[in-house]
Amino acid sequence: PVRIRSSPRFQPLPHFFIMAKLERLVIHCTATPPGREVSAADIRRWHTAPVSQGGRGWRQVGYTDLIHLDGSVERLVPNNEDRTVDPWEITNGARGYNATSRHIAYAGGVAADGTTPCDTRTPQQKSALEHYVRDFVARFPGAAVVGHNELAAKACPSFDVQAWLR
């Protein structure tokens, strides 16, 4: 099983969404250069800070979990670990798919220049992601595992998820 540590400062969303069936796991990268660690606070700031302050202005972060460089997995948004996506579990990872998805990101995904997409996963991150995906598939049979780039015109997660799954 994957060990996940909780992140502080969780803020639930208002309960105006209808609960939906979990249909997929979406794999993301943080679009940071190799070796740069990313914290839950970084993700929160990037995603929820007002646009005027350099953020995206979202109500919630884009990922359920974050895989750090050392392979540890940090929970950013708590969930019930069941097949239903409750309103407070919804993250903003892929427009049009969020109510039926969980999202995981690994720290990295771009070359040292900070812009060129590049699979920068460390061996520890690759192992953690493999265990995470295997656990997800075992717990939620029939749910898809996709890269963000399969749902939107993005390079994220900077590797071919379907080829990797084979």
Task: Indicate where each model-derived feature is located.
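Basic/polar, cationic surfaces and motifs that engage anionic cell-wall
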Residues: 4-10, 16-30, 34, 57, ...
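Short Gly/aromatic-enriched secondary-structure transition segments
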Residues: 40-49
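Conserved active-site loop region of the serine DD-peptidase/beta-lactamase
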Residues: 49-61
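Glycine-rich loops and low-complexity Gly/Arg-rich segments
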Residues: 51-53, 89-92, 129-131
